[in-house]
Structures are given as structure tokens and as C-alpha cells.
């Protein structure tokens, strides 16, 4: 059942250069120098307490290969939720941080292997971090590091450090022409120190040279919007402004259909393509001040009409929050508020998005009120929910985060320890849950837990449950 990768410490040995442009040996890009030192990275080698003051760790902060300055934009340290200096505190909740790397590829050869290289100078010896690597929101790896060398490493004394070299194969089809992203996060434990991060791949690959704007992604929307000139299927253009005020233009099949002036920050543009009655392939080009940023092909086909409600993701705002703030299919003023729970009891109990497990799905999420948890399981019977930091404890299950969906009125996730898909929805007075069990595992069951971890503890003074039939139970 354990999905983590346990790595022994080893000395980092890499025969690569320190430049940020591709060479003829398959090194596509590098951040830092693989020399077991942190001095060339931002805040290195000892200013870890300035991490928050320099706005590192937030989801909108990034390092853009070919544009960003490694000494200013890539921190030498990444705190974990166990680090007070990283923002975690008893009254502030857990704080997790990300390091985001953006890069553009002009071409993807049909043949050739890719590897992401992460060289760590050291990590916490007392609370080893659980490192998560996410590539283009489609491939994720979780790596449980072993105990590091010394607490002194974070202050620049590397005499007892234990460097670690990670080589992560990138699956075929994950990288794409145009914009790509890699996110490095610490989900559990304490700090780690970066030495070098790089991408290896076919030597024929060409990097995008970012100037005034960088296109993260371009894709056709799975919906249509109504306009005065008829329905449109948006072409979703995700672009970062870099400098100046470039004029962005989008062409479809050789005709300009959209233009705007970029000013600051990130734009997620809905470029209106005329809706079609049947599937067809079109070509697009995205330009900034006339310079081609990205081109490609897009499939256009009939889609359902979009509503404002479909833009909602109920997970937004749930991090570091309280019991009554959670994702799920909640009706306005509903008596039933179904949601996944994954935390221990306490004021933060309920849902924390960085805990990639589920303890149960419970029905009540109001201030000072909670209860009635349900959980589909199979295999050996467990009767306690288990601990938030140990997904192997109790009946809780790890989840596949990439399968999680939380629009208005619906929640879905795959419980990977059991091979079960869970789906939730609700009316004002009733919750509905659908569990899809695998056919190759025995002892399938649905647990009903009346005393689950919640914001405050509570006593069950009077409980009655009776079996009405093979498919129905009733009680209070």
C-alpha cells in the first residue's frame, strides 16, 4: 500500500555545465551549479529566515528559464510545514510552499528520453521532508527523503551535509511544445536545500527565449459562451507578462480574432473562437508585438454552454482554514454539507489540500458541529480513522490528487489504497454518495463512523441504528 519512494543519501555526481542554455550532451537547462553548495542561489547560503520576507513559496511566484536571475528568483531553501520560520504556527495553521519552474520548448522530438534532475545539498536531519514533484499537472512523484546531515547546513556550514541526487524520468507525452511547468513542494516534514535543478533530454531540443511575454499553455475550452454574435468556444490562452506593454494578438486559421495589451502579472484569456457544429482542426498563432510566441493546432467541437457556476472550484480558500470551510456539494443553507475530511481533531480539522489522503466523507460542517462520517474500504477491517501524517494508519486512504474534482454540486476523487472511486453530491436535506469498487479486491464495505475527528470533541449520548433490509439502514 505504501506509495512513497524511500531514498538513501548519496553524493551528487553530475557531469554537466552550469549554463542555462542547451548543449550537445542532452542537458536542456540548468538552475544552479551541481557543486554541493548553495551560494549561487537566492538567499544562499544562510538567509533562510528571509524566505517569507522575499515572497518566496507562493503559487504565483516562479522562476522562468532563460529570463529569471537565479540569484534573485530561485531560493536555496524550501521550508516544510514543520518549520515555524516558514509560517506554520499553532494559531496560523500549517504552511506549505512551492517552487515553480517555467520553461518553453520549441520542439519535442518523437524519440528520446527525458529526466528531471534535482540535486539537494542537504535536508533536515530531524524531520526529513516529503518532496512532491509535479510536472505539467499530469505527472506527480512523491519522494520521502531520509534524515539529512546537519542543522548547520541551513546556516551555510556544509561540513556535515548529506547531498542527495534525484533523477526523475519524465513520462512520454508529459512535456509539450510551448510552455511547461514544474512545481516542487514539501508536503510533510521540514526544510531542504537546493544545489542544482536541471532537465535532460534529446540534444535536438530548442528552448524558447522569453522576452516580453511567456505563454504557459493554449487549449480549447470544454464549454461555449453566449455572445451577441453567437456562441463561441474559447481558446484558453494562459500567458505571463514579463516586461513593457506588449500588444498580444491571437490568430485562428490565419485570421486575427483577438488582441489586447498586456500590463502586469498573469492572464488567463478566453479568446472567442466561433462555435462549430462538428469536430474540426484549426491552427492558431499567439504573437506579442508581432513576434511569434507559440503556434499549434487545436480541435474545435460542440460543447455545452457555460454558466457562471461552472467557473467555481470549491477547493479555493480551504487551505489553512477552519472546520466549516471545505470543498463539497453544499446547497445554500443546506442541512447536509458533505465534504472529505483528512485532518486530526482541532480548530483546523476538516480538509487541508496538502494532505493527500482522505479519512472519511462527513455530512456536517458547521461551526462547532460535525459528525456522521462514511468511508468505503476493502481488505482487512480497520475501525479508526488514523492520523493525518500517517496515511497507512487506520482506515484512511491515500488519494490520486490528479483525479480530484470539486465544482459546485459535485466532488470526486480516487482512493488509491482501496482502488475505489468516490463521488458526492447533495440536496438541501440529503447527501448522495456513489462508490465504485474494484472487482479484484475482497471484503468490500462502507464504514459508518459516528464519532469522527472534528473542530471540537463531542459525546454520543444516544445512538440507534437498525438494519431495515440488505440495502437500507436507519438511525439517529
Report residues per predicted region.
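Accessory carbohydrate-recognition regions in carbohydrate-active enzymes
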Residues: 264-270, 275-286, 296-476
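Beta-strand-rich binding/interaction modules
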Residues: 244-253, 431
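Short, compositionally biased P/S/T/A/G/V-rich stretches that sit at domain boundaries
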Residues: 198-230
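Bacterial Sec-dependent signal peptides at the C-terminal "C-region" and cleavage site
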Residues: 1, 8, 12-25
Amino acid at each position: 500500500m505504501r506509495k512513497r519512494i524511500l531514498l538513501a543519501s548519496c553524493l551528487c555526481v553530475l557531469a554537466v555545465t552550469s549554463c542555462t542554455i542547451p548543449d550537445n550532451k542532452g542537458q536542456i537547462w540548468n538552475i544552479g551549479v551541481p557543486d554541493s553548495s548553495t551560494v549561487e542561489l537566492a538567499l544562499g547560503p544562510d538567509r533562510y529566515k528571509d524566505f517569507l520576507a522575499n515572497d518566496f513559496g507562493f503559487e504565483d511566484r516562479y522562476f522562468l528559464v532563460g529570463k529569471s536571475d537565479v540569484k534573485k528568483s530561485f531560493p536555496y531553501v524550501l521550508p516544510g510545514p514543520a518549520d515555524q520560520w516558514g509560517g506554520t504556527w499553532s494559531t496560523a495553521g500549517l504552511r506549505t510552499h512551492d517552487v515553480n519552474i517555467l520553461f518553453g520548448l520549441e520542439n519535442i522530438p518523437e524519440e528520446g528520453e527525458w529526466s528531471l534532475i534535482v540535486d539537494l545539498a542537504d535536508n533536515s536531519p530531524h524531520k526529513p521532508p516529503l518532496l512532491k514533484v509535479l510536472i505539467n499537472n499530469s505527472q506527480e512523484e512523491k519522494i520521502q527523503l531520509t534524515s539529512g546531515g546537519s542543522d548547520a547546513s541551513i546556516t551555510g556550514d556544509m561540513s556535515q551535509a548529506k547531498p542527495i541526487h534525484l533523477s526523475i524520468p519524465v513520462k512520454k507525452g508529459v512535456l509539450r511544445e510551448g510552455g511547461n511547468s514544474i512545481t516542487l513542494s514539501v508536503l510533510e516534514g521540514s526544510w531542504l536545500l537546493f544545489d542544482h535543478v536541471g532537465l535532460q533530454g534529446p540534444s535536438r531540443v530548442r528552448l524558447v527565449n522569453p522576452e516580453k511575454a511567456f505563454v504557459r499553455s493554449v487549449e480549447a475550452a470544454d464549454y461555449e459562451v453566449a455572445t451577441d454574435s453567437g456562441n463561441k468556444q474559447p481558446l484558453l490562452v494562459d500567458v505571463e507578462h514579463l516586461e513593457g506593454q506588449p500588444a498580444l494578438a491571437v490568430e485562428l486559421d490565419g485570421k486575427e480574432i483577438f488582441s489586447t495589451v498586456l500590463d502586469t502579472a498573469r492572464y488567463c484569456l478566453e479568446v472567442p473562437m466561433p462555435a462549430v457544429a462538428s469536430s474540426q482542426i484549426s491552427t492558431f498563432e499567439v504573437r506579442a508585438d508581432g513576434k511569434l510566441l507559440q503556434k499549434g493546432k487545436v480541435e474545435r467541437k460542440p460543447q455545452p454552454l457555460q454558466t457562471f457556476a461552472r467557473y467555481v472550484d470549491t477547493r479555493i480558500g480551504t487551505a489553512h482554514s477552519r472546520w466549516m470551510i471545505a470543498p463539497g456539494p453544499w446547497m445554500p443553507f443546506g442541512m447536509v454539507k458533505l465534504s472529505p475530511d483528512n485532518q486530526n481533531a482541532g480548530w483546523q480539522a476538516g480538509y487541508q489540500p496538502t494532505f493527500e489522503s482522505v479519512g472519511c466523507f462527513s455530512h456536517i460542517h458547521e461551526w462547532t458541529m460535525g459528525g456522521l462520517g462514511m468511508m468505503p474500504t476493502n481488505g482487512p477491517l480497520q475501525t479508526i480513522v488514523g492520523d493525518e501524517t500517517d496515511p497507512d494508519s487506520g482506515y484512511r486512504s491515500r488519494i490520486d490528487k490528479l483525479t480530484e474534482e470539486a465544482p459546485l454540486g459535485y466532488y470526486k476523487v480516487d482512493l488509491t489504497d482501496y482502488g475505489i472511486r468516490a463521488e458526492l453530491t447533495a440536496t438541501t436535506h440529503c447527501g448522495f454518495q456513489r462508490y465504485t469498487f474494484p472487482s479484484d479486491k475482497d471484503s468490500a464495505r462502507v464504514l459508518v463512523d459516528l464519532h469522527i475527528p472534528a473542530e471540537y470533541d463531542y459525546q454520543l449520548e444516544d445512538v440507534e441504528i437498525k438494519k431495515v433490509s440488505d440495502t437500507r439502514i436507519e438511525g439517529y
